[in-house]
């Protein structure tokens, strides 16, 4: 085995360098053998960011223990330290080895096995895999909807609220406001007496996600909603902006745009399902603060024709049964990323 070359060390604690990592999710095109090197490189960057988060949590825990030394009965600090230690330990064991199978008769390379921490808000590797599984599931439903309702057009919608310094307050404001908009749609479509018209009733089905970042210029918390909506009639931007401002009382920023006809629909859906990867755009400290706050929250939602889609919990790929394959094992090395394991661990196996 050749000598591993160390990459120039980059600061993966910064949002700028993290943008390079968050370039996309796995798609069917990346299953091709020729795409494996790029895929491995991206996984390596994801693991490197996870290691940076692990190290941050270790340092963060050390600081909390200093506080506990002077006040050993501070239950809140003790609990915060336990949560950080557990998260760091899970990150440490995530993605150290990747086991791929190359189904050479169809030239596909699939991720067969790996150890995942499933902390997708702080682990970009798990975020990539989770987002990819979600993308696959909803694209499958989208194809069914398109056959059933060929007259529907796809739109990207973004709902925002005014930036603010208090994350829980801003998040709650967005969540309550969006619930009002969804309720208006539901009441109108149900034919409830007195239910007013809403532009959102034009949406036959939608799937979307919540995101949080720092606002450009303000540096304050900027929660927002991204969604793909399917409509027979185009949403009037002016009307829905007016409605949204009336609901929120402080925000009128809504972006409504049709899918680019020169791109595959998967590109539009990808903007929604990259939500977990995008948390890596935050600094490590902000990333951890957001992850703690959103722990247990449902960040993905669906309505109408997209309701009921099941996303598998398993983050590996489905095997191609009865096809022959070669096994490929990769190990992560700090500073150089993933390298293929020693030849003796790559014995070809499969169905004769």
What residues fall within each predicted segment?
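Cys/His-coordinated zinc-finger cores
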Residues: 227
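Right-hand nucleic-acid polymerase module
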Residues: 1-221, 231-352
